[in-house]
Each structure stands twice: as C-alpha cells, then as structure tokens.
Amino acid sequence: MAKGKLYGIGTGPGDPELVTRKAWRLIQQAGIIAYLAPDDGPGFARSIVAEAIGHEVCEIIMRVPMRTGRAPAQSIYDDGAKQIAVYLDAGRDVVMLCEGDPLFYGSFMYVLARLRDEYPVEIVAGVTSVSACAASHLHPLVARNDSLVVLPAPLPDDALRSRIELADGIAIMKLGRHMPRIRSLLTSIGLADKTLYVGHASLGNELLGLLADAPDEAPYFSMLLIYKGDDPWIMR
C-alpha cells in the first residue's frame, strides 16, 4: 500500500482572505487535519481556516503548553507525529495547519523533522507575519542592497543590540511580556522614534502605531518594525 502524504499548510497571519488558493483547496479536501493548540481553547491556525474544514474531518490536536522550555513540547510533537504516522501508513493524506508560513518560526518544522524520512511531504507556503505587518503599515522592509534581520524578543539585550547594529531593516517579533524591556533597549540606542508597532496584523482588532503607542502588555502576535538604512524611498 502506498503511504499517504503529509501536507504542511501555511494559513497566513490571521485574515482568511490571505490564505492561498492552494492551501484553501487542500484544507477543503482534507479528511484528516492536525494542528497545535494551547492548553485550553482552539488553535489559532485552525480558527483562520475554520470555514474550509469539513464537518466529518478527523482532527489531531497537539496541545502545547505556552512555556519557554522545550522539553514538554518535544514529547507532544513525538506523540502528534506518531498519530499522524498511523494515518500515513494506512495510505491517508494528512494536512497539518500552521499559522503564517510552516517554515518561518513554524511549529510544523518539528513534525516535519520526525516524519520527512519515512513519508512524502509537501509544503504550501503562507504569508508571513513580517509581510503582513509591513503591509498594514504601508512600510517597505528593505530595498536594494539593504539587509533584513528578524529577531525574537526573548533574546538577551546584548544579542539584540549587536544584531540591530548590523542590519538596515529590523523586525522584532514574539513581543508579549518583553515589550517594556524592548522599549527601553530601543530608546537607549536612539531608535524609538523610528519604530513602528503592529498588533494582531490583518485581523479586525489590528493595532497600528509607533513604539510610544505600544502597550506594555503587548499581544504575543505583535511586532516592531524598524528601518535604519538610507534608501530615500523607505525613510520617513
């Protein structure tokens, strides 16, 4: 019996209209879907494409605690991959949903690493949060020979500072509880006035502003965009 195929589907940043046509079609056709969800409540990736999911679909839910340590999540990925493998061995295709793009800070990569050597895999790219945030602000990220760096806010200040110094365009993501510290860091290096804030990009409760407008209790799905290059078409 031929093995089933695993699809890693990017569901984009939040607005269902930003899901690609291919992703939507594959989700509509899926008999089995898998996705991550927090300890309690639905998964964000699933909520984005809820209208495309059929009523008789089998759902594999991997509930991952939102903690900094890796160990608890890895055992959950192990279990999730084993559940997916049962269907793949039976010749059934499985669609795994991942907000944004599956390979850009995407949880799908951990399942991919566990299954790619044994099963056929296809990945459908999704609109990244960085692209969505830039679009919401009408703000080009980089131009010509500029360099772009994407930084997770949990990094230590020294690491953030050194990477920011080398880049022309900067995106800082995963802000959440780190916002006060990041605000202080950017102020200390003279970039506060050049920093744009986006919360819940592409959604109905989207928040846009400058760093000064960003709440200290920022959503996890929020981002700061900075341009410190010299391209005249980007500088503002």
Question: What do these predicted regions represent?
Answer:
Residues Y35-L36, I61, M96-C98, I123-G126, ...:
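General beta-strand structural signal in soluble alpha/beta enzymes
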Residues M1-P16, R21-A23, Q28-Y119, L203, ...:
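Class I S-adenosyl-L-methionine
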Residues G100-L166, P215, K228-P232:
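Class I SAM-dependent methyltransferase SAM-binding "motif I" and its flanking Rossmann-like core
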Residues L6, I164-R236:
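A contiguous loop/helix-start segment that scaffolds small-molecule binding in enzyme catalytic cores
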Residues P13-G14, P38-D40, V64-P65, V127-S129, ...:
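Short, acidic/turn-prone active-site loops that include or flank metal/cofactor-
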